[in-house]
Structures are given as C-alpha cells and as structure tokens.
C-alpha cells in the first residue's frame, strides 16, 4: 500500500507526450507514425470487455499499466514552430483471451526504451496473490487512471513551455539577423545612407562591437536549445527503436510493477533534470532581458516603431536603389519589413518604392488630421462646458478646473478645511473669532429694528475674500446685478413669486433737483438692463414671465422718474422691438396699449432684420393709419442708418403703400390688386429672381437722397397752397433755399460716411445685389432725369435741354448674372478691396478683374456728387478712366473732395496704389511731411509706397515717379520767388527729397538704381532750418530697412547722413530703428578714411525731447522701445570710441519714459515673448546705469503694478543702494511707500514704524511713513487683505478698546494728534471706497471692527472716531457717483437714517 501511495505523487518529466497503445500478438510496438504540425494524442477511456466464452466462476484478469510510446519529432528548430495539442483521456482496458500475450511496459522514468523488464515471478505464488488483487481491484484502476492523467498534464505543460522558449529564441534570432543584414548593407554601400543621419552613424559605430557578441549569442542560444531538447527527450531514432525491440516479457506481479514505476534512481534523476531545466530557463530569461536592455540603450531615441522607420527611410534615396542588386534589395526589404517572395529585381524595387510612398502618404494624412484637430480645438476654445460662465478659458482648461474641483470635493480633509475657512472668514485666529462672534451678537440685538438686520439671514455675509462674496436669496434684490451675473433663471423665479426687486437705483432717491447728466445715466443703465433681458428671454414659453413682469412691477418700469427723461411703456416697447423680442412686443401691444410710432418704431423693426417683427409693427401702424388719416406716408429716408434690409421686407412696405417712391410704385405695383387694410397675409411678390437676396442699403443711401429734395419741395408747395400763398416767386425762392440747404447738409454729413465705400465695406455678393437693385428699378436713368430737372428746369436758357438715357457697361440683368458665374463662391464672401488687391499684386491681365471693375463702375455712377470718395478710389485703382458724371472732371473731383483740408487717408491710398494725382494736386509739403512723421509713430510697418503694386510692374512705378518728378520741377521753375515752401524752389526740392526717401523705404535696389540714372536731381539734399520741426525731423536713416540699402546709400548719398546743428555737422544716430543698422553705420564710418575731416570723433550725443517724440516711435510698440534702449546701451558701451555721453542729457532721460503702447496694450502678459522682451529691457537699462551717472524715476517708467513689481524686485535684488537717501533712484518717502505697496511689499513699509513731526514743540508720533497714498489705493481697489494688515500692524489704537483708553490717559496731546491723523486717513480711505463702489471695505470693517462705525459706545463718548461730517460726506459721494448699494448698506446695516435730501437741506 505504501508503494501505491508513493506512486500517486505527481511526476515531472522532460520527455514529449507519449502515445499509449495496447499491443496485440506479433505487433511491432515501435512502428513510427507520421506527425503533422498539430499532433493530437488520444487516450481512450477504459473499457471492460467480456471474453468470448466466459467460464464459471467468472475469471478476474489482472490489468498491468498500459504501454506508453513517445511521439517522434520532438526536437526544436529555429525556422518553424509546431503546436502540439494533447487530449488526455483515460486508457482503454481490454481483457484479452490470453493474459500472457499482454505486454506491459513501464519505463516512464528510464532513459531509453531498450531496458529489459523484470523477470516473471514463480507460478507458486500466483494463488496467494489472487486474493490481494481481488481486494485491490477498484483502488488499482483509480490509481492507474490518476497517474496517467497527471503524467499527461505535466507533459503537456512542459511541451507548451518548450514551445514558448522556441518562439522567443526565434524572434531574437530574427532580430539579430535583420541587424546583421543591415550592417552588411552599410558596409558594402557606404554612400547609401547620408553621413549626417544620426541613426546610420549610431549603427555604423556600434555595429562592429555588437557583431561578435551577437554571433556568439546566436550560437549559444541554438546550441543550448538543441542540447536541452535532446536531454529532455533522449529518444533514439525510429531505426534504433526497431533494432532494440525486446521480446515480449511476461506479466509481472503488482509489487514488482510499483518497484518499476518509482525507483529511487529515477527520482534522483528527475530532480536533477528539474534543477537543470530551471537553471537553463533562468539563464534564458536573463539573456533576453540583457538583449532587451541593449536594444533600449541602442534605440533610446527610436522607442516608437514609426520613428524608427522614419529615421531609416530618411537615409534611403530611391534613385540609388535602382543601382543595387537583387540580393541587396531583398535585404533592404527585409529590414523594412516588406514581404518578399521569389520576385525579380524590378518587382522587389517596385514593392520597396510603393512601401515608401504609402508610408509618406500615411504620415501626410496623420499631419492633416492633427491640424484639423487643432483647428477644432481652437474653434471650440470659447464654447461653454456645463453652462459655465468662464468665457476666456478654453474647453481643456475648464475641464481641468472641473476635475480639480471634484478631486478636492471628494477629499474629506481638504473639503473640511475649505468649509472651515468659509465659515470663519479665513483671516483671523480663534480669539478674534470669539470677539467677532460677541460683536455680531451685540449688533444683532441692537439693530433688530431695521428690516435688513432683523436676523442672520438678512446680513450681507462676506465669508471668504479669496473665492467670492456669498449672498442669500432674500438679499438679492437688484435686477441689474442678476442680469449682469446671467442669473435669468433666478429672475424668472423671483418674478413668478412676486418677490421684492429693484429695477433702477434712481427710484430709491426721488429728488426734485436732479441733474440732467444723472437722468441720462440712469436711463442708459435702465435700457442696458432691459436689452439684456429681451435678448436672453425671448421664447414663446416666456410669455407668462413678461405678463407677470409688466403687471406686478408696472410702477417700477412704466412710471416716469421725472418730467424730462421719461421711462415709460414707449421706451420699453422700443427696446423690445430693437432686440427683436417678438413675445414681449406682442404682449405690450395686445394687453398694455403700446402703440408703435411711424418713423421710429418702424425704423427699429427694419433695423432688427426680422420679417415677423416688421410685419407686426407695419400692420399695427397700418391699422392706425386707417383710423387716423392725418398720418404721413412712410418715407425712404428711414433707410439712412439701416444695414441690409431684405427684399421681402421691401415688398411688404410696397404692398401696404408705405414706400413712397413713385417710379418704383409705377413699375412694380401697377398690375397689383387693391390691398385690404386689414389683410396681413396678402404680400406682393415681385421679381422672383431677387426675392430672397440681401443687399446693403446703407451704401445706396446716396442714390435716394435726391428724392428727399423733391419731397421737400412738394411738401413746401403743398403747405404753401394750404396757406393760400399764391406768390410764385416765394415758392421758387423756397425751393431754391431747400435745395441749397440740402446740398450743404450733404456736404456736412459726408464727412461721417466718407470712408464707407464699396472698396472698404462691401463684399462681392453685396456689390452684385446692389447692382441688381439698380438695374431692376432703373435707378440710374431716374436719377439723371431728376438731376437735370433740378438744375436746368429754372434756367434762363430758352433752349430746352434734351435728356437722354445714359449708356453704361452694364444695362441688363443678364450681364450681371454672367459676371456672377465667373466669380467663385469663395470670392463672393470676400471684400471687394481684398479681391482687387490680390489681382493687382498678381499683375494679371485686365480681363481677370474686368467684371468687378464694371460692377464698381455701375455702383459709383449712381449719384457721384455724394460718392466722391468712391470715385476717388475708383480712379486711383483703375487709372484715369472716369466713371462718374460727365460734368465732373478730374480737377473738379479733387476740388469738390477736399479743397482746403489735406486728407491723410487719401494721401495714403494714393501711395499704396501708385496714383500720383493726389500728390500733384496738393502742393503743401509741410502736410505731407507731417503725415509721415505721425505715420511713423502710429504704424509698426509703415511701408506705404507701392504696397498694392506688383514688384514686377516697374512701368507703373516709374510712371508714378516721373509724374511727381516733373511736377516738382515745373512748380519750382514757375514760382521761384515765392515765400512759402509749397510752390518754391525749396518746396520742389523737398517734394523730390520726400519721394526719394519713400523709394529708399521700399527697399528695392533695382528700382532705386534706375531712378538715380533717369532722374538725377531727385537725390539733391537741402539743409532746412531747425525752426520747421516737421521737415527737420525727416532724415534718411529712418527710411533704411536693411544693411544692403544702408551700404548703398552710404556710398552714394553720404551727405544725407549729417545734420546741421549748432553750426556743425552731427551724425544722426537715433534715426536708425535697430542696433544692427547703427553698428553697421559706425563700422562704415570707421573704415572710411575720407570722412576724417568731417566726422569728429568723441562727439557729444545731443537731442531735444521733441526730436525723439517725432523721430523715433518709442511709444508705438514694446518692440521698438526695446530697440531704442538697446541702441542707448550700445552708445554707452561705445565699442568704436565715437560717442561721449553727457550724463544729464534729455536724451538719456527720455529712456525712462513709460513704454506703454498707443493701443493701451500692457507691457507684460502671459506671453513668453513679451517676458523675454522685458528681460532685455532690464538688461539694457542696467548697462546704461553702469556706464553713466544717470538718475532714474521708477514711477515714470512703469505705470502698471505688475511691471512696477518686477522692476522693484530687480532693484531690491541688484541695486538696493539706489533706494537710499541721495541714491540714483529718485523717489520720495511717500512715493516709495506707495510703490512698495503697488509692488506687493507692504510689509516693508509697515516695518519702518512711525515718523515724528517736529513742526510743533516736541516730537509727535503720528503715522507710518508715507501711508496716505497707500490707504487711498486700498480704498480704491478694495484690498481688504492690506486693510487688515494696516489695522493690525500700523494702528495700535484699534487693536483693543482697553489699549486705546490707556493711550488716551498717558499722553492726551500725543494721543489726540495720532487719533486725528487716523481719522483723516480713515475718512480718506472710506471716501475712495465709496467713490469706486468697494462695498467689501465697509463690510470688512463693520463685521470685524465694528467699533469704528459705532458712535454710541463709551469709548468715543467725547468724540466719535468718524464724525457726522465724515458720514455725511460719504453719503453725498455715494449719491453723486451712483453707488447706491453702499448707500443702502450705510443706511440700513450701519443704521444711519440720513438721506442726501436732508443733507442738502441742512
């Protein structure tokens, strides 16, 4: 039994899964069988078969262990791997007729199958063992099945492990083979990979070192795998098995079978094999790890396969691949991972080429996908997430903030900490909290009478100053605050409940003597608030909200505040119409008797662009007209300030007879049926091609203005007839006066709309629609008829003027549609100006933009007297071709446009398009020079000449220069004795000189060389007296943009680089705009020996403040200011010894001026580039300070607190000695304290202590140094943190009440002086807080230091800390500056029942 128990233990063997068969007589047990890639070994379940002639009693057979045959082909190979699936089933037990023929072979743990079995025992003992066998029959069967199953499972596990190791070894060998192939390719073709390729260099250097180790590793792996597999299997080949086949042994007894199964030697061998297997497996794992580390070390820059492949493909040249052999191409394809077969060289090359092209296409698609993704992120950057009110942050930042919030919210420790700070205010320790609680209990009991302080729920709690102020439901009563905070849901809820709401702060103070400015401001705030409400709440479901709003709060909305500026139902209705809130407008008309006004209401409705709103207002007005016949018809004049009314709206106006344009009515509604006044749905439909198109009507205003004159004349005639005035002369005089007044009004109003032209604000689509409208209504011919009637109707000529129809390039709708087909969809949405500019820069044929030119000509031809700027732009763009009226020539055009005033915009446009007409007509040189001086200060890139002229179009450029050149010579010769600059010889020279400088600014050396040859007098230099500052400040260095142009000008025009000053020539260094040009200029001066007599070395750098103000645009941008300081630092360093710095010159003092931009852009923001510029400014400034004895003023240098803070940090860290008395930093003690506070260093000010006033007898301790400006800023900006530091650190009088009493008893005079000083400063602080609306200052003092506001305490019985005069002053300032929330706080919370009216009466 012990042997049986021992045999049940699991066995671990290294052989392959055996094959189990029962052998019949004369059957070869070693006959091999074919094994496929998937070998399945099936073990049949045991079956008990009865013999053919069973005797009686039944015979019991003794079953020996089954024969186990090993499978063949168990050795591992490096090329292919086999997967063996073994299905383990219980062995089949057969009871043969003769037991002696059953051979049982049990050699599971023997090294080979040739071992001989044990001899057959004696027959004498057979009878004795029969009983034992019968007793152990069941246990033996179970025992045999369990043993076989366990053995098969173990063998299967071992086989799977071997296969896994084989696959790993094969992968490693393949990797080594790929590296060897690539190394051979590099060695054979060195020119294949460029030497600059980093990957090839690494392979080239490290491959020789790895070659020996990789070959040795490959041999070791192959030998180890083969040895281990052979040791595990140890199976002879099939031929040896057949030769060593022993004769069938007899059946052994049961104890002998157990001895064969588990001998001690086999157990020891098995343990040794297990240990060897574990060791080899560990060695193999370590080797693979080592190889992996080597690969990571070698490919540390190519961790990603795509990057690894990209670096390989960078070094491959497809043209060189064609010269390689087929074997080399296959190696390259194998290295790249391209599948290779038995292909020819051409096929292999095509496969590699297609692989490389496909890889490039994939990378391109990936880049396009990333770019689209980035664009989507940018477009979604300002969208809201979860109804957030953060508009400035992109979506990613909002999501990160939300994630951070929920992480903190789930953290119990952080959540309790934050809630604890919110509950106690976050500022004070436990003792101060207790004092605050005691004070709060006192205030609640004392102020329980007021409605705002009756309970804790009525207070304006300000728990945390870090996050925000928190208000309770009943405290939110101001509608303006609710609307500004976008809490429209809260507004709806409060209106539905009928809660208390304050719509206008002015209603709380109803005084009779209110200023007009206050009324206007109140009306503006009211309109702004209701505009937000109408724009946000406009759905049909909100009808109940507006009904409750207008019903329950009518006294606050519709009642008039005063007699001058009423806020009534008309104003509210007009706001609803303007905001296109159809729900509120319908409700006001139907239930609240709101009646729209003809001109104003309809104008607002058309301006909104909503057809439904226009229809509602028009039908309402039309009903009123039917009831009131005195209403005048609607005039086209209301379109003067409206943009883009639709054709559908115009149809409705024509239908209801509100559009009084006689010719259009005759053309359009001649065949229309009569329209019922009450019919709202009967809409006239005309011109189906223009039904849904939109046009810009504001730019067509000038085409209809002549009708106003006719209407005015007709109205005057009608009025005169009604008044029975039959004097024709009077009528004629009235008509003439009306015409003259209209013309004068047109010229005055023209200055407001002069820049609104087709070339500035029109898109191509709007231009096409406007031309369609002109052709449809035949407006051009109608205008000409009215124009000639107005000018020639009352003339004395007997001959009648014949009025003929004018012919234009476009006369029919088909021509416009043909032009429209030639324009792409993308160009239709572009501005006309941009399309024309692109066409001009391309220098294409005229046919390319002839269609746009014809459309512009048709538009400009309509009423050219009021479209002179359009005519001017058309002329400078398209040349001398006149599209305006025939009686308006070129000279009249310029005289009519601007005869007395120089227009810088027209001058700029003429330079950009290369049109010389405006330059020639206006001969005032001073105005041109003044424009260029201002231009340099306002524009960063001021290159204007030939901006929209193609660089290849030299003919147009030379033509422009020639006309101006000849005109300047003619003017100089004709008026040589003139006194002014314009028209004189000097004026002509200056005119040519200005043109010459602009050509230099264009930075075109080819054009400049041609101009010098053809126009030699253009470069003549003329010295001008300094009195004329505008002309004096234009110098050649300001126009040079490159080093090449500097070298050319220095060698050819040297006289232009020196200035007359103090009867000596001085170089103009500050005209250059960057230090590189200045350094090059100094190099040219040093290298040139001919100028030694003129250029004086060690010359003084002198200039006036005005020179810098006009010459260098130091205030235009931060970049230019940085360049300016770099130039000053370069001059201070003086590498060539050319400059001597005068220490107190205004030149250096101008460096400390504020570098704020003209657009108000701050110096620093989160942009990294601007931070780097700021660092460069600091480094340049430090260089200037080190090389000179200049004193500087920090307050003048930087106005922003963030800039000043960084600058003071730099001073404290690097130049702290400048802050001492008499130091280079010029600043007073008060200003220094103020600057320290603005730099965030209030602690330094507070540590200085008190200063003493020695004006009176004895020294009096009054206040810390220079805190007056600091306290003003605390009240101005609402800085409660600094206020608390000031109260706790600087004013010991207010720490405790007992301390104050003791101080008063010790030295009454000194204490009273300090007390009065505190009063003054606190009243000033509260005054600033009341002016700027900082209610948090009042809340902080009231809830934490209430004794400052308490007048009834014993402490201030003799004199309150803040007197009544101070409180009255605060109330008046709150009233004057419209800070009514602070006024409510003072009256209701603090408890001062004083009104501004009472204060004024007293």
From Swiss-Prot:
Q: Which residues form a coiled coil?
A: 350-383
Q: Where is the composition biased (Low complexity)?
A: 38-47, 59-94, 210-234, 254-279, 430-453
- Could you confirm whether the keyword Cytoplasm appears in this record? no
Q: Where is the composition biased (Pro residues)?
A: 48-58, 235-253
Q: Where are the sequence repeats?
A: 12-18, 40-46, 60-66, 86-92
- Where in this protein does the record put region Disordered? 1-20, 37-94, 109-133, 210-292, 429-453, 712-745
Q: Does the keyword Coiled coil apply?
A: yes
What does the record list as GO biological process?
cell-cell adhesion; mitotic cytokinesis; sorocarp development
The UniProt keywords, alphabetically, are: Cell adhesion, Cell cycle, Cell division, Coiled coil, Developmental protein, Fruiting body, Repeat
Cited InterPro entries: UPF0746_actin_org (IPR051904)
From what superkingdom does this record's organism come? Eukaryota
Which stretches of sequence are listed as region 4 X 7 AA repeat of T-T-T-[IV]-[AQ]-P-P? Answer: 12-92
State a GO cellular component annotated for this protein.
cell surface
Role according to the record: Required for correct organization of the actin cytoskeleton and cytokinesis. Also required for apical sorting of prestalk cells, a prerequisite for formation of the tip at the mound stage and subsequent formation of the fruiting body. May be required for cell adhesion.
Name of the protein this chain belongs to: Defective in tip formation protein A
Q: Which species does this protein come from?
A: Dictyostelium discoideum
Name the gene that codes for it: dtfA
């Amino acid at each position: 039994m012990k042997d049986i128990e021992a045999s049940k233990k699991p066995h671990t063997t290294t052989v392959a899964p055996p094959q189990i068969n029962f052998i019949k007589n004369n059957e070869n047990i070693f006959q091999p069988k074919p094994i496929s890639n998937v070998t399945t070994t099936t073990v049949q379940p045991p079956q008990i078969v009865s013999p053919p002639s069973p005797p009686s009693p039944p015979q019991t057979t003794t079953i020996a262990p089954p024969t186990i045959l090993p499978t063949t082909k168990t050795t591992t190979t490096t090329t292919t791997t086999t997967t063996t699936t073994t299905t383990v089933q219980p062995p089949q037990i057969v009871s043969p007729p003769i037991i002696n023929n059953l051979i049982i072979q049990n050699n599971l743990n023997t090294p080979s199958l040739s071992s001989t079995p044990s001899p057959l025992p004696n027959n004498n003992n057979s009878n004795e063992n029969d009983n034992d066998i019968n007793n152990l029959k069941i246990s033996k069967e179970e025992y045999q099945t369990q043993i076989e199953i366990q053995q098969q499972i173990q063998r299967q596990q071992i086989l799977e492990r071997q296969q896994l190791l084989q696959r790993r070894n094969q992968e490693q060998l393949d990797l080594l083979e790929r590296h060897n192939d690539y190394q051979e390719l590099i060695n054979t073709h060195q020119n294949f990979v460029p030497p600059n390729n980093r990957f090839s260099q690494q392979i080239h250097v490290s491959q020789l070192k790895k070659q020996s180790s990789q070959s040795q590793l490959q041999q070791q792996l192959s030998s180890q795998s083969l040895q281990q597999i052979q040791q595990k299997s140890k199976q002879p080949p099939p031929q040896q098995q057949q030769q060593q086949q022993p004769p069938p042994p007899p059946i052994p007894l049961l104890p002998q079978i157990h001895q064969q199964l588990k001998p001690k030697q086999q157990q020891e061998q098995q343990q040794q094999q297990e240990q060897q297997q574990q060791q080899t497996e560990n060695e193999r794992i370590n080797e693979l790890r080592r190889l992996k580390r080597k690969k990571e070390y070698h490919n540390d820059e190519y961790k990603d396969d795509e990057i690894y492949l990209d670096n390989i493909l960078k070094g491959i040249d497809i043209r060189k691949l064609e010269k390689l052999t087929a074997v080399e191409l296959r190696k390259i394809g194998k290295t790249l991972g391209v599948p290779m077969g038995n292909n020819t060289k051409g096929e292999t090359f095509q496969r590699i080429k297609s692989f490389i092209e496909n890889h490039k296409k994939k990378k391109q698609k990936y880049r396009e996908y990333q770019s689209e993704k980035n664009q989507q992120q940018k477009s979604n950057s300002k969208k809201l997430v979860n109804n957030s009110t953060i508009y400035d942050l992109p979506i990613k930042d909002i999501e990160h903030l939300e994630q951070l919030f929920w992480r903190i919210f789930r953290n119990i420790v952080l959540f309790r900490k934050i809630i604890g700070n919110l509950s106690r205010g976050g500022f004070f320790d436990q003792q101060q909290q207790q004092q605050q609680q005691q004070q709060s209990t006192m205030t609640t009991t004392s102020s329980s009478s007021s409605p705002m302080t009756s309970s804790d729920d009525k207070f304006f709690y300000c728990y945390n100053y870090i996050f925000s102020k928190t208000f309770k439901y009943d405290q939110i009563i101001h509608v303006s605050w609710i609307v500004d905070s976008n809490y429209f849901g809260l507004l709806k809820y409060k209106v539905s409940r009928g809660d208390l709401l304050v719509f206008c702060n002015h209603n709380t103070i109803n005084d009779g003597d209110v200023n007009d400015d206050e009324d206007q401001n109140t009306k503006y705030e009211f309109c702004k608030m209701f505009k937000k409400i109408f724009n946000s709440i406009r759905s049909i479901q909100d009808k109940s909200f507006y009904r409750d709003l207008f019903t329950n709060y009518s006294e606050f909305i519709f009642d008039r505040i005063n007699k001058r500026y009423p806020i009534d139902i008309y104003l509210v209705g007009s706001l609803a119409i303007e905001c296109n809130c159809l729900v509120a407008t319908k409700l006001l008309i139907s239930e609240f008797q709101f009646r729209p006004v003809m001109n104003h209401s309809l104008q607002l409705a058309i301006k909104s662009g909503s057809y439904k709103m226009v229809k509602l207002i028009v039908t309402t007005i039309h009903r009123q007209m039917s009831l009131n016949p005195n209403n005048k018809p609607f005039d086209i004049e209301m379109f003067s300030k409206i943009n883009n009314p639709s054709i559908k709206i115009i149809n409705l106006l024509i239908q209801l007879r509100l559009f009084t344009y006689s010719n259009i009515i005759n053309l359009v509604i001649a065949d229309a049926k009569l329209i019922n006044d009450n019919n709202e749905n009967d809409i006239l439909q005309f011109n189906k091609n223009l039904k849904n198109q939109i046009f810009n009507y504001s730019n067509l205003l000038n085409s209809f203005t002549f009708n106003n004159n006719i209407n005015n004349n007709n109205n005057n005639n009608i009025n005169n007839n009604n008044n029975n005035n039959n004097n024709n002369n009077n009528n004629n005089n009235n008509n003439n006066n009306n015409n003259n007044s209209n013309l004068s009004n047109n010229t005055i109003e023209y200055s407001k709309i002069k820049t609104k032209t087709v070339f500035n604000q029109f898109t191509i689509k709007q231009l096409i629609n406007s031309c369609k409208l002109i052709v449809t209504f035949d407006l051009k011919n109608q205008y000409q008829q009215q124009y000639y009637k107005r000018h020639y109707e009352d003339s004395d000529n007997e001959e009648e003027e014949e009025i003929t129809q004018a012919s234009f390039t476009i006369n029919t709708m088909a021509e416009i549609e043909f032009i429209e087909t030639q324009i792409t969809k993308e160009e239709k949405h572009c501005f006309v100006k941009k399309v024309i500019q692109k066409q001009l820069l391309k220098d294409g044929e005229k046919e390319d933009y002839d269609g746009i030119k014809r459309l512009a000509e048709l538009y400009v031809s309509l009423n050219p007297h009021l479209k002179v700027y359009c005519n001017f732009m058309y002329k400078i763009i398209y040349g001398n071709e006149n599209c305006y009226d025939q009686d308006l020539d070129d000279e009249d055009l310029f005289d009519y446009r601007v005869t007395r005033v120089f227009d810088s915009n027209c001058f700029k446009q003429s330079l950009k398009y290369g049109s010389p007409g405006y330059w020639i007509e206006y001969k005032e040189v001073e105005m041109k020079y003044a424009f260029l001086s201002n231009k340099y200060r306002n524009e960063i890139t001021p290159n204007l000449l030939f901006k929209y002229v193609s660089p290849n179009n030299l003919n147009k450029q030379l033509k422009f220069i020639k006309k101006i050149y000849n005109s300047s010579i003619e003017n100089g010769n004709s008026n040589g004795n003139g006194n002014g600059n314009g028209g004189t010889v000097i004026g002509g020279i200056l005119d040519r000189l200005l043109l010459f400088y602009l050509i230099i600014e264009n930075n075109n050396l080819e054009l400049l060389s041609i101009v010098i040859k053809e126009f030699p007098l253009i470069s003549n230099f003329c010295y001008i007296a300094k009195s004329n500052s505008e002309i004096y400040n234009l110098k050649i260095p300001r126009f040079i943009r490159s080093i090449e142009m500097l070298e050319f000008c220095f060698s050819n025009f040297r006289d232009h680089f020196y200035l007359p000053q103090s009867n000596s020539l001085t170089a103009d260094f500050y005209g250059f705009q960057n230090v590189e040009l200045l350094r090059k200029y100094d190099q040219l001066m040093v290298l040139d020996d001919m100028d030694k007599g003129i250029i004086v070395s060690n010359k003084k750098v002198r200039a006036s403040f005005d020179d810098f103000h006009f010459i260098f645009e130091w205030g235009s941008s931060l970049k230019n200011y940085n360049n300016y300081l770099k130039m000053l630092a370069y001059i201070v360093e003086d590498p060539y010894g050319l400059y001597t710095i005068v220490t107190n010159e205004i030149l250096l003092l101008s460096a400390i001026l504020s570098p704020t931009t003209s657009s108000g852009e701050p110096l620093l923001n989160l942009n990294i580039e601007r931070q780097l510029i700021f660092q460069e400014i600091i480094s340049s400034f430090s260089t200037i300070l080190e090389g000179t004895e200049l004193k500087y003023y920090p307050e003048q240098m930087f106005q922003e607190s963030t800039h000043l803070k960084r600058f003071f940090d730099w001073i404290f860290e690097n130049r702290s000695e400048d802050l001492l008395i008499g130091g280079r930093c010029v600043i007073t003690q008060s200003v220094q304290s103020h600057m320290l506070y603005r730099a965030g260093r209030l602690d330094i000010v507070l540590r200085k202590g008190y200063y003493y006033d020695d004006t009176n007898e004895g020294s009096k301790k009054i206040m810390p140094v220079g805190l007056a400006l600091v306290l003003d800023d605390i009240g101005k900006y609402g800085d409660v943190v600094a206020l608390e530091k000031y109260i706790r650190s600087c004013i010991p009088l207010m720490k405790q009440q007992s301390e104050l009493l003791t101080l008063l008893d010790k030295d009454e005079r000194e204490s009273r002086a300090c007390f009065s000083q505190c009063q003054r400063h606190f009243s000033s602080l509260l005054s600033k807080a009341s002016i700027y609306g900082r209610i948090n200052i009042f809340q902080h003092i009231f809830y934490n230091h209430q004794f400052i506001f308490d007048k009834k305490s014993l402490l201030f019985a003799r004199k309150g800390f803040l007197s009544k005069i101070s409180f009255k002053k605060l109330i008046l300032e709150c009233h004057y500056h419209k800070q009514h929330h602070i006024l409510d706080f003072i009256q209701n919370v603090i408890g001062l029942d004083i009104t501004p009216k009472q204060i004024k009466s007293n």
